[in-house]
């Protein structure tokens, strides 16, 4: 049987990189590209070592564990033991998740690809059956995206609704600070980009927008407000109109602004939620003034930039 070592190594390098990306996504870790490449290279080097006298070492469970430790440390670094074990166990979780999915899909479709000693190869002679290679190359990324979306759904369901949070939004050179309420009833998205929308009371935006522009937005229909705001309004290029439908109402439009950066501060962590829109409400959101914004629960699925200990 011919084995194209360079092709197998390249595939495993890509798969290791995807596993490390999934691990980082699960833990909300920010990983530098050079660390990701380094970790994936070390992981894929097992393929090369299997054809050397070191093969018994890398095939032994202790050898595989040692490689996993090195991969995790190179990719995520080492700060403390708790941090390290979180990374290691999550890496194994991602590996078992993807490996189980591949085995399940293999059993279902009866593909000719197999996993041997942690390395994915094909049973065909030569370069392999095009269908089996298509399964490997297409199936793994598809399973990766499927797993990522399911993890996002689980995170959204586990969010503690009705929790109060602090929100910092950067618009141009100015920063807005508001108190927000995480509300499961807020399921408003931009229908084109699927960007979640948080709602903020317009009074909080007046110091940033200016008095004249705030009056226009407050007293006119969103469609008319866009027409009346002239080029002197510095946030005109960031304004969006989002269609929505309230209970017992016909289709309406909500005027939104695209922030440059948004940070949400919960009791446990600070979350970067840059992919969002700020919907402008002309009515007060809380009668007793306990909060000034309604936070879309999907925004809490962003990357944690700091954990509160």
UniProtKB/Swiss-Prot annotation:
It is found in: Cell membrane. The keyword Membrane applies. Its main location: membrane. This is Sporulation sigma-E factor-processing peptidase. Probable aspartic protease that is responsible for the proteolytic cleavage of the RNA polymerase sigma E factor (SigE/spoIIGB) to yield the active peptide in the mother cell during sporulation. Responds to a signal from the forespore that is triggered by the extracellular signal protein SpoIIR. GO terms for molecular function: aspartic-type endopeptidase activity; peptidase activity. Belongs to the peptidase U4 family. GO terms for biological process: asexual sporulation; proteolysis; sporulation resulting in formation of a cellular spore. Its EC number is 3.4.23.-. Disruption phenotype: Does not affect the localization of SigE. It is a multi-pass membrane protein. It is an enzyme of class 3 (hydrolase). The active site is at residue 183. Self-associates. Interacts with SigE. Interacts with SpoIIR. The keyword RNA-binding does not apply.
